Amino acid sequence: PPLLMPPALAAWASTAVVLPVDRALRREALAFLRANAELAPAVRAAGGADLAERLRAYAETPVPAGAHPEQVIAAILVIERDKDWRRERTRVAATQERLGRATAGQFGIPPTA
């Protein structure tokens, strides 16, 4: 299933400052969210609490008190995914702009729109 921002943490996430999360921890958190429905309740609760606590360390903006651990995991992963997407969009736009400048008017052919 797609990774969605938990509505309960959307307001927090819109202004939260989250430092880049270690790739191994991101993979572990994603794997947990994919498999959590199949885990025994005690294992799910303990694993979720542990991952949420480790991910909270990357949040410079404190996560709201009482937030469910699995919502914390999802929110921080969504923030990270969205930052990655914005970075990639910026990179692609810059590359296209450089390519456009580099090829504009070559060989006496006017650039096309």
Feature names for model-found ranges:
Residues 1-113:
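Membrane-interfacial and juxtamembrane segments of integral membrane proteins
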